[in-house]
Amino acid sequence: HFLNAAGRNGAETIGKVIIAVDEVLAAEAPEAVLVLGDTNSCMAVIPAKRRKIPVFHMEAGNRCFDMRVPEEINRRIVDHTADVNLTYSSIAREYLLREGLPPDLVIKTGSPMYEVLSHYRSRIEQSDVLERLALKAGNYFLVSAHREENVDSERNYARLVAMLNAVAA
């Protein structure tokens, strides 16, 4: 399902996510919901819980301890609303236990990305993508700059690009 829930700001997006997910849950009637990560779409936890559908949160327990970060707010809401929290690391599990979550409902699974990378490692190593993009191994870096504090402000984005250019020089 494509939710088409983008809003003019975080609050509007979250509201649209809740409404759209509730409609999907009504139509599909799933036995459980798996929520992955900490983006605004993880607020799917709210309509699922309202419909008494069990929620599993994968990537639970991650913390930056900065409540100014929207994803940190989302993490805490989802972690404390989900029925079962699936953590990628021991430290993430420990954070949730310190926050009072029951140990039997906080399960360390490890990172599925590690499994994917391990599975495809030989194909990655044989890939000609560096050649096709005219890149030298060790002479480039990849940046994920999707956080709103980095990209929603032209000033912040320009500073980020300037910093990356300085590192690359």
Q: Which residue stretches match the model-derived regions?
A:
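Short beta->alpha connector loops at strand-helix junctions that form conserved
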Residues: 3-6, 36-37, 58-61
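A nucleotide-sugar donor-handling region in carbohydrate enzymes
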Residues: 4-5, 81-159, 163
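A conserved, positively charged/aromatic
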Residues: 63-83
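An aromatic- and histidine-rich active-site surface loop
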Residues: 34-51
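Conserved nucleotide-sugar phosphate-binding/catalytic loop shared by glycosyltransferases and other
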Residues: 1-16, 20, 24
